[in-house]
């Protein structure tokens, strides 16, 4: 069994202040960390991927979609932005060396209709 820690406990944006935190997690025996991917910055995530690899830590990544980029919105422009932002998140997670990307990114975090998905929402989710 492997153990990892989600860095959202400390930050929503990776920066140099996280270096001692990540080093401490490695010293405690964690096998990996989950990196927040909330910005489009390939260079930043490439740098963090190298750091994590040098420390001997595995990397996973987390991202979310909001109301403004909801992949199952009834607004085609909002859906398109959601799909584009998911692609960017995948690119940034890959730059960090992440072995998986978790969400929720299939729909907007915290946006609820009070009922199950409609046929259109289901289709938009599949298309995204």
Description of each model-found segment:
Residues 5, 25, 33, 52, ...:
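Conserved, mostly hydrophobic/aromatic
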Residues 76-128:
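Active-site acidic/histidine proton-transfer and metal-coordination neighborhood
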Residues 10-16, 35-47, 70-72, 109-113:
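Acidic-and-aromatic substrate-binding clefts and catalytic sites of carbohydrate-active enzymes
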Residues 1-9, 14-29, 97-99:
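Histidine-acidic metal/acid-base catalytic patches
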Residues 20-27, 42-63, 88-98:
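Acidic (Asp/Glu)-rich catalytic clusters
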Residues 18-20, 47-50, 76, 115-118:
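Short, glycine/charged-enriched secondary-structure capping and boundary segments
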Residues 3-7, 33-35, 59-64, 101-103:
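Hydrophobic faces of well-ordered beta-strands that scaffold small-molecule active sites
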């Amino acid at each position: 069994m492997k153990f990892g820690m989600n860095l959202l406990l400390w930050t929503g944006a990776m920066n140099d202040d996280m270096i001692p935190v990540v080093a401490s997690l490695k010293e405690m025996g964690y096998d990996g960390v989950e990196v927040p991917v909330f910005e489009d910055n390939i260079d930043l995530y490439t740098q963090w991927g190298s750091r994590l690899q040098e420390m001997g830590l595995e990397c996973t990544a987390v991202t979310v979609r909001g109301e403004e980029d909801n992949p199952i919105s009834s607004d085609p422009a909002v859906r398109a932005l959601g799909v584009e932002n998911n692609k960017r998140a995948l690119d940034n997670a890959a730059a960090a060396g992440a072995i998986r990307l978790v969400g929720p990114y299939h729909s907007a975090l915290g946006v609820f209709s009070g009922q199950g998905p409609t046929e259109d929402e289901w289709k938009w989710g599949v298309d995204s």
